[in-house]
């Protein structure tokens, strides 16, 4: 695995142990494929998995990744765009255990997944995950509560960590799941400021005034 303690986290989830992690997705990694792989392992063992994301685009990404490794009947999506009737019908199917893997937007955090073993919330700093109606419930609060009460593993993931996720890490309630520093250096883009040396300024005196100096065009 590309993450420190990543393999032990996956093993714990698959074994049915309670593991909680703040996952900082490394540059270039396909987070949807990673979650799909773990959710499929959980479902294969007869348990349930729940993935909550901010918008339809992320739901589509997770659904596509899941359908590459599990049957379509194993995956249930719950989004506002489906309309009340279709959403309620899918809610009932989840309640009766007809779909072991549920993927959806904010309200999917309440999905009654049978034998829930693993839950994931991506990009928990996104405003779409906060209910605009009182009491303004955040999907993060729903899933952390469910993890505590139902004893399921939990991932809070994103490219950056929110203050709330950091507090959970510092309190010891969950641990961090990050790539080693050397790996991050290798994956991160090389950043070069235009006109950051006397040599560059001699070659292109107008670099300070130009929106795109000549060095940018040369790099492109």
Regions found by a protein language model. Give the residues of each.
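Flexible beta-alpha connector loops of hexameric P-loop NTPases
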Residues: 79-84, 126-136, 200-208
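Conserved interdomain linker/interface between the two RecA-like ATPase lobes of SF2 helicase motors
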Residues: 2-33, 153-220
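Conserved motor-coupling elements within RecA-like helicase/translocase cores
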Residues: 61-70, 74-116
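Motif I (Walker A/P-loop) of helicase-class P-loop NTPases
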Residues: 31-39, 63
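Pre-Walker A (Motif I) flank of P-loop NTPase domains
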Residues: 16-24, 46-49, 99-100
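Short glycine-/polar-rich loops that comprise or flank the Walker A/P-loop
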Residues: 19, 46-47, 71-74, 115-117, ...
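SF2 helicase catalytic motif II
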Residues: 97-101, 106-155
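Conserved RecA-like ASCE P-loop NTPase motor core of nucleic-acid helicases/translocases
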Residues: 47-55, 76-80
